[in-house]
Amino acid sequence: MNSSIKRLHKEYASFQAGDISGLLLLKPVTDVDMFHWKAVIEGPTETPYEGGQWVLDIHVHEGYPISPPSVYFQTKIVHPNISWTNGEVCMDILKTHWSPAWSLQSACLAIISLLSNYDASSPLNVDAAKLLRTGDKTAYNSLVRCTTYLYAKGKIEDLS
């Protein structure tokens, strides 16, 4: 068993042993492929994402944990640092600031934190960033609440 797979088995066991606020599910998609994972996250309280649940599609590469995973929102979401078209997440820790000290669990927690702390200067969703840059936080929050209701409030299919 290679070191990436050993590490992923340990991470899965660690997630199963704990109760992580905001991270409802983190597991391999199948028992035979440890390099493709799903996660379900909850929107942070006191944000326009509150009450929503999003499915993340996580692809782990052979060089893990030296190389970062690729993470995509499978559920539609409005956020300046998340692509509306393909769900790609723009975060330094998933690119140039990745460290082997990070885990899939800590990456998911960082994504939950990103929902509260956007960076409108480096957007993947230009329309969302424009609302924030022009100071129209009310319109941004309304758009987020609306799309959260439309896409992230339904029952998530059984992924367990």
Swiss-Prot record:
Enzyme nomenclature, EC number: 2.3.2.23
Active-site residue list: 90
Annotated ranges, domain UBC core: 3-153
Domain of life: Eukaryota
Keyword Transferase attached: yes
Name assigned to this protein: Ubiquitin-conjugating enzyme E2 16
InterPro entries noted in UniProt: Ub_conjugating_enzyme, UBQ-conjugat_E2_core, UBQ-conjugating_enzyme/RWD
Pathway: Protein modification; protein ubiquitination
Lineage of producing organism: Eukaryota, Fungi, Dikarya, Ascomycota, Taphrinomycotina
Pfam family for this entry, one: UQ_con
Function, in words: Catalyzes the covalent attachment of ubiquitin to other proteins.
GO cellular component, one term: nucleus
Entry keyword set: ATP-binding, Nucleotide-binding, Transferase, Ubl conjugation pathway
Reactions performed catalytically: S-ubiquitinyl-[E1 ubiquitin-activating enzyme]-L-cysteine + [E2 ubiquitin-conjugating enzyme]-L-cysteine = [E1 ubiquitin-activating enzyme]-L-cysteine + S-ubiquitinyl-[E2 ubiquitin-conjugating enzyme]-L-cysteine
Root EC class: transferase
